[in-house]
Amino acid sequence: MTDTGYTEELLPGTFDALSVRENGGNTESDTSSIRKSQNQDSKQEDVHRENLSVQTLEDHTEVTETREQSVSKDLFDLPRAPASLDVKGLQESDEDHYVKDLSDYKSMDPGKPGTVPTNVSEIFNSNQPTLDEPIQFTRVSSSSVLSESISEGDADLISHLEGKVEEGNNLTSKETPGTIESIVGDKTMSTIEGSSQNIGRISTGGRMTPDLSLMGGALETSSDFLNSTQTSNSPKITTPITEVDANDVYESPLNEILSSTDSFNKASTASADHSKHVSVHEVIPEEEPHPETTNEDPPIKTPVMVNNFFENQTPVSESRSPFRTISSPFSSLRKNVKSQHGTPDHSQRNSNSSTSSNDVKRKTGTKKKGVFSTFVQNIKRNSHSEKRISSGSGNGSGNNAFKISTPYNAKHVYHVGVDSKTGEYTGLPNEWEKLLTSSGISMKEQQQHPQAVMDIVKFYQDVTENSGEEKVFKTFKVGGGSGANIASTPSFRTPSTASVQKFETPQMQTDATFPNENNDTPYSSNLQGPLLTNDFSETVNNEKFIPTRPAPKPQGSSTVSRRVEIPSPINSLGHGTPKVQRSDTQSSSIFSFKKMPTLKSEQPLPPIPKAAEKPANLLPARAAPTPPKPAIPTTPEQSSIPAIPSGLAVEVKEESNTSNVQTRKAQEKKREERKRKNQQIQSKLTEICTTGDPSKLYKNLIKIGQGASGGVYTAYELGTNASVAIKQMNLEKQPKKELIVNEILVMKGSKHNNIVNFIDSYLFRGDLWVVMEYMEGGSLTDVVTHCILTEGQIGAVSRETLKGLQFLHSKGVIHRDIKSDNILLSMNGDIKLTDFGFCAQINEVNLKRTTMVGTPYWMAPEVVSRKEYGPKVDIWSLGIMIIEMIEGEPPYLNETPLRALYLIATNGTPKLKDPGNLSHKMAMFLNWCLMVDPEDRGTAADLLEDPFITEIAEENTSLAPLVKLARMKKLAESMEDDENDEDKYDEQS
């Protein structure tokens, strides 16, 4: 070795490359010198291998000692803060500058100055390209590079010198053919790239997180680093390895070195000096990815450790924001494990590595990395406990912050459509479907008349809602000039029958103009508070009852979806004479009336008895019933206000307080107004009623009925011994006291032989006593049930009923409930109408026929269909009552109420069971009464001129035997019922 010397320069990743250096001598050219040189080369290689083994063993011993010291220290320092190093990767330069010793690479910790070898500094100062951009990483162990740079032969040699690894540092791995998927105990990953030939030819796989205090702006990435082989979208690199038998336990001699190296300890210690603590919620700046260029791939990012928590960072696609939020590492870990393996195995993770090129195959064997399993288990336990605490506190704070209340005032608006194919309704409410199903209306019938079904269901519902109300006068405008205008509110209640005890008439507009029939000068009256003023000096001169509102206008051609709003008042209550025209106004409608074409203008009105002259100074036009304003149905938008959370601003509370104050003021104002009105009504009743105790003026009071507001009694007047009916009412329980005043005034001013007349009224101890005529013969229902009437007797009943209807219609009153229950007879056969107003309901109640079950059968089609109607609805009801007298019951009585309404609306004129038994005159009269079109239907005055009334009808006295027979049969039935009840009682006792 005098002429030529060999210096071993160990290259990263190879151990057989020698660099020949000349010492200045001349080389001999003979063959012997060449052979000698070759022999020396072989000997030198042997020496080199021996030196390498010794050097590696020494390095291993030194590292082991250092590890033992660091482990003892780490036991008290756990957990440590994350390390942040600013280390530039090693790369091979074009001038072949090599690392001269593997030991030079062992320590890369900038926290220990002076320990970095000079060879490394020379490499840093070289002109070779460097990585200017800092690289994120958790820990970089020099042992990973060391294990990478050991060849197979050297690994076999060292494997004999190493014992078993401690149990706490064992590596748990999942071995599959071609890959090893492992997760280290501390949840960290290091990406190792290299080849068995030259580590300098490969870009560094692991990137280290720089010191946050030294991090500047975005730095450019080295072109050599970007040339690493990886996928641009998801750079997950798995190192192909040889298959390992799953049953074999592989123990690497470098496990101790890999698990705890000098670099590992130095990096952990230096983290306290060069990096700040990063909380889980801190945002770490992340370098912005460069746009894709030729032969350039996005950099690989290693997992980042934050506050002793480790996160497996998946490749991030290009994003506009250069920041990301660090979240819990274990949630991402579970997500990755589930997506890769299907089971949440927290002890396994892919160990990623890269290959230098497609031409070079890795020759190294399988590698495993040991970790502190107990350290990781502590982290897991602490993390789970913190999560439980945080979740519990979160729930508690959420409960204390605000509470979600349940819905209130909820309304469900239905939209009903029609199936174009089947014609069936879709979206009907359940209640309506049940009604249609239980009513017996078949699906075919629903398809044939869908609009009729909708109308009768709506009508049925409205009547049911009003079942608890009391009946009041239903009036209309009659005769006297076509230019009369009456203002009325646009919302009206649906008419009902006598059994439905409550009816509501709309309020009149405050100022309404009526024609004065004595002259053409209209006069104005205040109808808002009728009969509460002192303007009652005008004379009546045989005027009409109450020229108030006409029949209300229906909804017209409204859509199906509007018709099915539940509930809503019916706006259509009439059709026929008089004709009504409604103009569009905001709060009221103007009605113009034409003269009734069927009413004879020259026909004299029946004279008013002289007994009525005393109260005749009242103005009838002011006697319009004025109930309280009906509730306006709210739209879905106005239905309810959602609950206000407690955490809203103070302004909202102030607004709500202000609104509450305003509401209270409005309520107080209404209360005062109601009190004032009650005082006025009380004063007016005292004015019009007779003073005294009615119990001392009448004898033998027998209670025959009981209503919601009082009872009905029969008595005999002292002196005359006339039979009377007394209706007792508690004024405190009357919601419409002003209507009572109106009716008393109307009945006082009207007397007719075919009307149950008003006798007197008394106000005693807060109770109102209304005394009226009483018909001892009972109702026509008893006669129809127990007797068979002839055509002459039917004609007599029809004539007397038409006389009473003519009188009511001439006064502008629609009875609306003509049926046998409301036709009363005396023992002499006299016939009077009753139940045309609130105070007139004094007949004995028949529960079966006065409930909703018995009411719809006498109704006119225009009422059922919710169209406009007028006084001719009473004529239709008279025709149904004639059928009742012929056959003993009205049509469709055996049908359900809803189906009866449907048949009335769709069938038109009902058919008789045996029409051949009727005479021609009677059949023509009945047909005239039952015309479907109200315009073709006769009026009361016209029907009184019909031959059936003038020629066939008998005198009233012909009815007296029927009345007596009916009373006897009824008495016998009652006695039989009493005996049956006694027998049942005896059997039970």
Curated annotation (Swiss-Prot):
Its EC number is 2.7.11.1. The keyword Endoplasmic reticulum does not apply. Belongs to the protein kinase superfamily. STE Ser/Thr protein kinase family. STE20 subfamily. It is an enzyme of class 2 (transferase). One of its GO terms (molecular function) is protein serine/threonine kinase activity. GO terms for biological process: response to pheromone. It comes from the Eukaryota. The gene is STE20. This is Serine/threonine-protein kinase STE20. ATP binds at I704, G705, Q706, G707, A708, S709, G710, G711, V712, K727. PANTHER family: SERINE/THREONINE-PROTEIN KINASE SAMKA-RELATED-RELATED, SERINE_THREONINE-PROTEIN KINASE SAMKA-RELATED. It catalyses: L-seryl-[protein] + ATP = O-phospho-L-seryl-[protein] + ADP + H(+); L-threonyl-[protein] + ATP = O-phospho-L-threonyl-[protein] + ADP + H(+). SMART domains: PBD, S_TKc. The active site is at D817 (proton acceptor). MAP4K component of the MAPK pathway required for the mating pheromone response and the regulation of cell polarity and cell cycle. Phosphorylates histone H2B to form H2BS10ph. Keywords: ATP-binding, Cytoplasm, Kinase, Nucleotide-binding, Nucleus, Pheromone response, Serine/threonine-protein kinase, Transferase.
